[in-house]
Amino acid sequence: MKQIIYITLAKNQEIEVWKLHDDFSLNLLQRISTQGEPQPIIISKDKKYLYIGVRPKFKVYSYKIKADGTLTKHACSTLPGSPNHFEIDHTGKYLFSSSYHFNCLSITPLDTLGIPRPVTQTIKNIFGCHASKMNCYNTCLFISALKKDCIYAYNFKKNGKLLKNTRKNFMTNVNFGPRHLDLQKCNNRLYSVNELNGSVDIWSINSFSNELILLKNINIMSKNYCNAAWSSDLHISPCEKFLYVSDRIENTISIIKLEKDVQNIEKIGHIKTELQPRTFSINSTGENLIVVGEKSNSFSVYKISKITGLLELKNTYSTGNRPVWISSLML
């Protein structure tokens, strides 16, 4: 297998395609103009297409992924707001676009050829709509509303519609600002990173009602740190034993060891990393973590210890200007 890395460059209005080798060296395969400022990217469930959200003309572009990982432009569709996060349901038929500045979430159908079709539904008045995450059963979409300190849950139907009258509200503490979400399938838990507070909330998901119950809050900032936080991204390792969280004030990635007993879940360490680490990616085998620095204009590759979950820096490479999103693909 080979690992391909996709990085969006907001200021350059480009996407870079890199190949990661077994010795952790990389080579640049391709650089493509995106005809606008690229923001979120996501790979289709069948690994055949890459979707990129751009602004100021709000669109989602699809690119065909060739056998070597390089891209060819395929199609595009208009979005109702500036995209900042994408999610795809488990069937691979529907793309959810969160818009923080336009306070909405939209649904774009994806046809069998990977073409994004016109938006079929827009949910408005989700203030600070930052990200979404589908539950294990493809029946409920969780959506973060950063400006409201809230996570919403909407029932999702097989016809690709969210039922607005089923919305449930789950509040964080005031001025926490829930941002990105991830799901731990083995324990049916939702994890949310709080941008303004520098912490992670751990939620239990009721398998029948999709109600969230807050189990624990974990601080990710340095000991005795008491200033403003600016936390951004989080990802659970494929083995579901470790959680990684980035913060853009301290320029760190924190490592949290996950346990079945929530009382035993704790932060086990952190590393200094790129300047302003807005997003990062863990490959599907759980062997490496790659983080981009929005201010450092570079990205770093870390080897993940499968025993301890700790990170070992293996390489750093320069990118174009303002890398804001990264995704990894095993081919």
From Swiss-Prot:
Q: Which key words tag this protein in UniProt? A: Carbohydrate metabolism, Glucose metabolism, Hydrolase
Q: Which InterPro entries match?
A: 6-phosphogluconolactonase_YbhE (IPR022528), Cycloisomerase_2 (IPR050282), Lactonase_7-beta_prop (IPR019405), N2O_reductase_N (IPR011045), WD40/YVTN_repeat-like_dom_sf (IPR015943)
HAMAP family from the xrefs?
6P_gluconolactonase
Q: Where are the transmembrane segments?
A: none
Q: Which organism is it from?
A: Buchnera aphidicola subsp. Baizongia pistaciae (strain Bp)
Q: GO biological process: any one?
A: glucose metabolic process
The Swiss-Prot or TrEMBL record describes its family as follows: Belongs to the cycloisomerase 2 family.
Please give the Gene Ontology molecular function terms for this protein: 6-phosphogluconolactonase activity
Query: Can you list the GO cellular component terms from the UniProt entry?
Result: cytosol
**SUPFAM superfamilies in the record, alphabetically?**
Nitrous oxide reductase, N-terminal domain, Thermostable phytase (3-phytase)
Described purpose of this protein according to its UniProt entry: Catalyzes the hydrolysis of 6-phosphogluconolactone to 6-phosphogluconate.
EC number(s) reported in the record? 3.1.1.31
Reactions that this protein is recorded to catalyse? 6-phospho-D-glucono-1,5-lactone + H2O = 6-phospho-D-gluconate + H(+)
Going by the entry's taxonomy, the superkingdom of the source organism is recorded as Bacteria
Q: In which pathway does it act?
A: Carbohydrate degradation; pentose phosphate pathway; D-ribulose 5-phosphate from D-glucose 6-phosphate (oxidative stage): step 2/3
For this protein, the record's Gene3D superfamilies field holds:
YVTN repeat-like/Quinoprotein amine dehydrogenase
Q: What is this protein called?
A: 6-phosphogluconolactonase
